Amino acid sequence: RNYPASLTKIMTLYLVFDALKSKKISMNSKFKVSKRATRQPPSKLNLSAGSNITVKNAILALVTKSANDVATVIAENLGKSERNFARLMTRKAKKLGMTRTTFRNASGLPNRGQLSTARDMATLGIAIRKNHPKFFKLFKTKSFIYKGVKYTNHNNLLGSYSGTDGIKTGYTNASGFNLVASVERNGQRIIGVVFGTL
């Protein structure tokens, strides 16, 4: 087991996609930004407390910039609190068969209780594509512009490795480099995971 770092945000997005699919929210719905969210360390969009961000921009901020402030905004708006949202994330993980995964926050910022495995992350990568194919396409977004600033995707395989169509990178000092990658060639799809490479 290791710290999933920003691969955590795949599950955060899974719950956003669930809410979109069940029509609880739409892409144009607005999430309110709390003071607590603005205090999250980078990587971030530097949102202002009291402002709003649309669901679509929140998704793109996680996919490209891996913004920690936005992950907290999502958690607080969908789960009432980040702690409660993390419980929902863990519950969903168990439901998907991710038996060795526990979430404590929505961003992947260091927390000793937030742990997963390469196998569980592969399970999540497969599940999010299978259960949310329409939204999964957003993981191949190469860049997005928010308030005049362009943010590019941290996944360097996009555009450089043929057939890559997602999904997410992660890094903290404690976890090392993490990656869940999705590649399709000649009708064959592979979901690969690199977990904790220093």
Regions found by a protein language model. Give the residues of each.
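Domain-terminus/edge residues, biased toward the C-terminal soluble/receptor-binding domains
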Residues: 98-102, 110-198
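Active-site-adjacent loops and short helices of periplasmic peptidoglycan-processing enzymes
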Residues: 1-119, 128-130
